Amino acid sequence: MAGHSKWHNIQHRKGIQDVKRGKIFAKFIKEIIIATKTGGSVIENNPSLRMVIDRALAANMKRNTIENAVKRGSCDLDDKNYDEVRYEGYGLAGTAIIVDTLTDNRNRTVANIRHAFSKYGGNLSIEGSVSYLFIKQGFINFETGDEEQIMEVALDAGAKDIITNDNGSIYVITTTEDFFTIRNTLITARLEPSHSEVTMKPINYIKLNLHNTEKFIKLTDSLKDLDDTREVYHNADISDEIITQF
């Protein structure tokens, strides 16, 4: 249980301040356009669109900006064709890194990712080289809430696990197949999560020292900052004492 909490804190600790707000919004717009093109503009029938819109709103993106992005996707006003491409590699101390991207130019994207890995002591590898070190699963986070009610609704809906943390937050863990059903069931029961996503959780972690952490953070920040990057996952274990120095 503690491991999952640590993983989530590491992945989201720096949050929005890692990247300029304009770049974050540009990425949301791209994801909204693609989700709309793929599943339609009716949010009730398109869980992927609902997810990205929720994330955009949580980042304080304006509703009219979101609506314009949906319009661009539904009316084919954006003529670019995007591919979902995953890149895998290694950071310092053998840490495993996954970079999920949305790109309209694979050559540009791989060149930028390779440059980031090389600049900060990493190595871009081949497909499948590190993904086996992670488990794909659904993650639903409640910063506060009625633990008993959340547990009852989530488990009845098919959740794999419920994790309660010392700070009062509650994590609901699901399979990828059941994620949207369980999330919608919780929302219908008026249990609104503060954050939810389908993510990649490391099976094991690699502990980093202060020296390695500095270059590792520069690497992951550089990867996150790329225009084509959607998500960056890793299995680094960075202590609270070290992370507070950055």
From Swiss-Prot:
Cross-referenced Pfam families: TACO1_YebC_N, Transcrip_reg
SUPFAM superfamilies cross-referenced by the UniProt entry: YebC-like
Bridged cysteine pairs (disulfide): none
InterPro entries: Integrase-like_N, TACO1_YebC-like_2nd/3rd_dom, TACO1_YebC_N, Transcrip_reg_TACO1-like, Transcrip_reg_TACO1-like_dom3, YebC-like
Biological processes, Gene Ontology terms: regulation of DNA-templated transcription
Residue runs in coiled coils: none
Keywords associated with the record: Cytoplasm, DNA-binding, Transcription, Transcription regulation
Source taxon at top rank: Bacteria
Subcellular location: Cytoplasm
Keyword Transferase tagged: no
Predominant subcellular localization, coarse grouping: cytoplasm
Keyword Nucleus found: no
Endpoints of the signal sequence: none
Family as reported in the entry's similarity comment: Belongs to the TACO1 family.
Name of this protein: Probable transcriptional regulatory protein COSY_0365
Source species of the chain: Vesicomyosocius okutanii subsp. Calyptogena okutanii (strain HA)
